[in-house]
């Protein structure tokens, strides 16, 4: 989806974008680059790129290069709804970690990324049954579930259904690094 000069029409920004804080094929050929900006959580993160989840059942997979994240950054694959869910890579002072979060239960699962700075993230959704499951891969072929299966119920707060989201933000209220 990100090999051209413009986004395909299916993609939309979740907020008004800051055009200085993202690039498509300019800073790194063949990649979308998101510069992290301050936000406390995914729903407040600017420059979050979204599209409606394809149903009734689908997978969304992304390759994430987290090598240029800075401490406090989180970048990943979200499921925007009310409640939302996410699987991201978080940079702490001890290194990179996967963080799977379910706002519905307020549970999070952390897993250290030992040496890998590149990870594939996947969201499985059965949108008729309101079920989501995240998984990850270190090679793009072998996938391991992370966290429990989540509920993403139909609700009337946002009228949008689940929107798959690519995001990067910094919880330390700083402009951070970049996610490709």
Mark where each language-model region is.
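Extracellular glycan-recognition regions
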Residues: 1-180
């Amino acid at each position: 989806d990100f090999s051209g000069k413009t986004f395909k029409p299916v993609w939309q920004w979740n907020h008004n974008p800051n055009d200085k804080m993202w690039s498509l094929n300019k800073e790194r050929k063949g990649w979308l680059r998101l510069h992290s900006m301050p936000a406390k959580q995914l729903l407040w993160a600017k420059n979050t790129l979204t599209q409606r989840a394809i149903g009734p059942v689908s997978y969304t997979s992304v390759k994430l290069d987290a090598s240029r994240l800075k401490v406090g950054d989180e970048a990943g694959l979200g499921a925007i709804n009310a409640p939302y869910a996410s699987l991201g890579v978080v940079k702490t002072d001890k290194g990179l970690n996967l963080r799977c979060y379910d706002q519905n239960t307020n549970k999070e699962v952390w897993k250290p990324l030992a040496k890998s700075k590149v990870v594939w993230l996947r969201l499985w959704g059965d949108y008729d049954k309101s079920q989501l499951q995240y998984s990850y891969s270190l090679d793009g072929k072998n996938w391991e579930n992370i966290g429990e299966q989540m509920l993403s119920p139909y609700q009337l707060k946002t009228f949008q259904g689940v929107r798959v989201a690519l995001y990067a933000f910094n919880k330390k209220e700083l402009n951070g690094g970049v996610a490709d």
